[in-house]
Amino acid sequence: MHVWSQLEFINNVKVEATMIKNFIMNHGMRLSMFNEFSHLKLLSIAETRFASVVSLQHMVISDKWSIYKEDASTAQHVKEKILSDVWWGNVEYILRFTSPIYDMIRFADTDTPCLHLIYEMWDSMIEKVKKEIYLHEGKEPNEESDLYSVIYDILIARWTKGNNPFHCLAHSLNPR
């Protein structure tokens, strides 16, 4: 139970983000409003995340958002989330500490030979995740972080499951 309680905030943000995206995407008028305020794809992974946030905020504070009365309670909830600095702070935090994991997966999932780099990349990824979590929590490297412990255990379990002798051999034979 301890593991899930540490990760619950991630699921809550994911559920809210999915609800916001679906609310806008599944209502023609709301989608039209979003497209009016932004020429970006809604909530797609991009370096233009900030522009999407600004567009969403402009959309929900516009007169058109207030005038359109379909599903007013959900619209109000969406507006509160989009204007919430706390919610966006959680989104940014999750993106910061999962970014090294995402980058590692993206790099390893290419046609570029990288087997010889996996050990060092994995260690580097874990250190970057730790750095982001500890920075956010205001902890020193020698202190204990419940969230980091849970994520570390997940990453190590994944490494143990996927690690094979070829990684070790490739790492050993890599000329530096």
Where are these regions (language model features)?
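Extended, C-terminal/distal alpha-helical "rod" segments
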Residues: 63-176
